[in-house]
Amino acid sequence: MSAPRVSFVSLGCPKALVDSERIITGLRSEGYEISRKHDGADLVIVNTCGFLDSARDESLEAIGLALNENGKVIVTGCLGAEPDVIRERHPNVLAITGPQAYESVMNAVHEVAPPAHDPFVDLVPPQGVKLTPRHYAYLKISEGCSNRCSFCIIPALRGDLVSRPINEVLREAEKLVQAGVKEILVISQDTSAYGLDIKYQEAMWQDRTVRTKFLDLSRELGEMGVWVRMHYVYPYPHVDEVIPLMAEGKILPYLDIPFQHASPAVLKNMRRPAHQEKTSRRIQAWRETCPDLAVRSTFIVGYPGETEEDFQMLLDWLDEAKIERAGCFKYEAVKGAKANDLGLEQVPEEVKEARWHRFMAKQQQISTNLLKKKVGKRLPVIIDEANGTIGKGRTRYDAPEIDGSVHISSRRPLRVGDIVTVKIEASDAYDLHGTAV
């Protein structure tokens, strides 16, 4: 009996990508083959995103495409929390499950295409199946979020914070390193809250006691000899404790912190920490401890009630903080979000668009000036793409897909996953250019 074949579509954020990796690992362990095409597969699984309207539309379109090309479709992920929305558009899907419903997905697969077990074939590597390139991997440390930001529905979709035991997380990280991963990207909905839900429970790791806590996790990962990058860090005071580890080179001098805005009025409406001056002082203090620190953040413009004065405050804050990387989103109403019930005046779409362009122009200017300062330096760069002696990679200050790149020329052939020293010879708004030495 030939092995059943499953085609897979993974949409959304890195957290959803890790969910997809877990499902695919389960499928491979039961003997299923993963098909690159819908046509010819026994069924298709679509892992959806349901956070923004644009993401919902993309998910519904992907489901429709899978139905057209295959006909047997199982839907999971965040949009799966709203089965009526999916059934209304696509009544012929076989099964719908919400996020993190791994067993339900596997049960649905078993009903459509029962597994063909082959106990003599080892189909799954020890670290599980990864959908990222071999040299980096996402490490998800928790599920859900206990914050109640008014623009967000993640707690409704994924529940409150549930931290994974620290010894389990460290075992997974160790397997990744043993498999050749050179960079671990720590992700969750709220990385700095890690362990709060279980009162920083202690566990044994390599004959010593460690706490399920952001600091302990950072310290232990920092001993594994690979790049460790922290994402989705909420700006709690105890983040300060991790900065010395960055200064010591234990983990990368990189913090991904979604500040969202700088106006106290807007932040209050968002139900976010509303102390932009305090935030600026903390960034300054972090840089005093770790001068090499790169800060990435995301912001929302056009939030209900945002005035021109509020927006100008955000631009002024960018000028003052001079963070290395910043993404910006135009506010989009999310079904079920508290922001819809605040009774605030909506910002016209053309004003949102104009503010977005002004924000991006400001940050581009800041980025250009900061990158110029790296010209002439020699920096370690991890290679993401290689074609003979030409390649593209990233410095310690840049995460994959969302940040800038280093365009490299070399006398010797470059290999994906290698970390090479590059002399930076030129820069532009977002990228660097240099020669491997």
Curated annotation (Swiss-Prot):
Residues 372-437 form the TRAM domain. Keywords: 4Fe-4S, Cytoplasm, Iron, Iron-sulfur, Metal-binding, S-adenosyl-L-methionine, Transferase. Catalyzes the methylthiolation of an aspartic acid residue of ribosomal protein uS12. GO terms for molecular function: 4 iron, 4 sulfur cluster binding; aspartic acid methylthiotransferase activity; metal ion binding; protein methylthiotransferase activity. PANTHER family: RIBOSOMAL PROTEIN S12 METHYLTHIOTRANSFERASE RIMO, RIBOSOMAL PROTEIN US12 METHYLTHIOTRANSFERASE RIMO. It catalyses: L-aspartate(89)-[ribosomal protein uS12]-hydrogen + (sulfur carrier)-SH + AH2 + 2 S-adenosyl-L-methionine = 3-methylsulfanyl-L-aspartate(89)-[ribosomal protein uS12]-hydrogen + (sulfur carrier)-H + 5'-deoxyadenosine + L-methionine + A + S-adenosyl-L-homocysteine + 2 H(+). This is Ribosomal protein uS12 methylthiotransferase RimO. Residues 131-369 form the Radical SAM core domain. It is found in: Cytoplasm. PROSITE patterns: MTTASE_N (PS51449), MTTASE_RADICAL (PS01278), RADICAL_SAM (PS51918), TRAM (PS50926). Residues 4-114 form the MTTase N-terminal domain. Its main location: cytoplasm. Its cofactor is [4Fe-4S] cluster. CDD domains: Radical_SAM. The lineage of its organism: Bacteria, Pseudomonadati, Pseudomonadota, Alphaproteobacteria, Hyphomicrobiales. One of its GO terms (cellular component) is cytosol. Binds 2 [4Fe-4S] clusters. One cluster is coordinated with 3 cysteines and an exchangeable S-adenosyl-L-methionine. SUPFAM superfamilies: Radical SAM enzymes (SSF102114). GO terms for biological process: tRNA modification. The keyword ATP-binding does not apply. InterPro entries: Elp3/MiaA/NifB-like_rSAM, Methylthiotransferase, Methylthiotransferase_CS, Methylthiotransferase_N, Methylthiotransferase_N_sf, NA-bd_OB-fold, Ribosomal_uS12_MeSTrfase_RimO, rSAM. Belongs to the methylthiotransferase family. RimO subfamily. Its EC number is 2.8.4.4.
